[in-house]
Curated annotation (Swiss-Prot):
Keyword Transcription: no
Organism: Shigella dysenteriae serotype 1 (strain Sd197)
Lipid-substituted positions (N-palmitoyl cysteine): 22
Gene3D superfamilies attached to this UniProt entry: Lipoprotein localisation LolA/LolB/LppX
Name assigned to this protein: Outer-membrane lipoprotein LolB
Subunit structure as annotated in this protein's UniProt entry: Monomer.
Leader peptide range in chain numbering: 1-21
């Protein structure tokens, strides 16, 4: 059952900055090695973060629908996180709270849904097949289960290619926020066939 009036998030025009395709300067030469100590150190620094939060703009584009929203993502512990989507007027459209074995989602009518898999729930209720389980790692600049990826000249992720459950995701990182330590993604794009997901992070708070 789709979320009641969820697609009110479609209020357009979509932010041009969010929808602009990623442009990445490809490093000359073979690129940085995934076996480099700098990359291993960066991954370790990110994994050492206990809590973090970010907010920004979200867009989902496919042949069936075009959705724009503001988002707030907060991780409070291992496998405990909160995702909030609001429409351009600032009203909450979706709030998701996840912890091991339990996921709760509240829609814009106050209807509460529960499940044990956040990714499956989001897909069924919104019609957007967001790879949430992998995105939890990708949004941090970590490859997760992906083994096919490239690094930029600063030993950070620049591209990921990942296939699972019939989906072939390509993730491109358009930039990083170097005001935080370690540097965190500032702009990224996920594509799978005719669907595209854009995330632009305004800022990060890490602990």
């Amino acid at each position: 059952m789709p979320l009641p009036d969820f697609r009110l998030i479609r209020l357009l025009p979509l932010a041009a900055l969010v929808l602009t395709a990623c442009s990445v300067t490809t490093p000359k030469g073979p690129g940085k090695s995934p076996d480099s100590p700098q990359w291993r150190q960066h991954q370790q620094d990110v994994r050492n973060l206990n809590q973090y939060q970010t907010r920004g703009a979200f867009a989902y584009i496919s042949d069936q629908q075009k959705v724009y929203a503001r988002f707030f993502w907060q991780q409070t512990g291992q496998d405990r996180y909160r995702l909030l989507l609001t429409n351009p007027l600032g009203s909450t459209e979706l709030e998701l709270n996840a912890q091991p074995g339990n996921v709760q989602l509240v829609d814009n009518k106050g209807q509460r849904y529960t499940a044990d898999d956040a990714e499956e729930m989001i897909g069924k209720l919104t019609g957007m097949p967001i790879p949430l389980n992998s995105l939890r790692q990708w949004i941090l600049g970590l490859p997760g289960d992906a083994t096919d990826y490239k690094l930029d000249d600063q030993y950070r992720l620049s591209e990921i290619t990942y296939s699972q459950n019939g989906k072939n995701w390509k993730v491109v990182y358009c930039g990083y926020d170097t005001k935080t330590q370690p540097a965190m993604p500032a702009n990224m794009e996920l594509t799978d066939g005719g669907q595209r997901i854009k995330l632009k992070m305004d800022n990060w708070i890490v602990k």
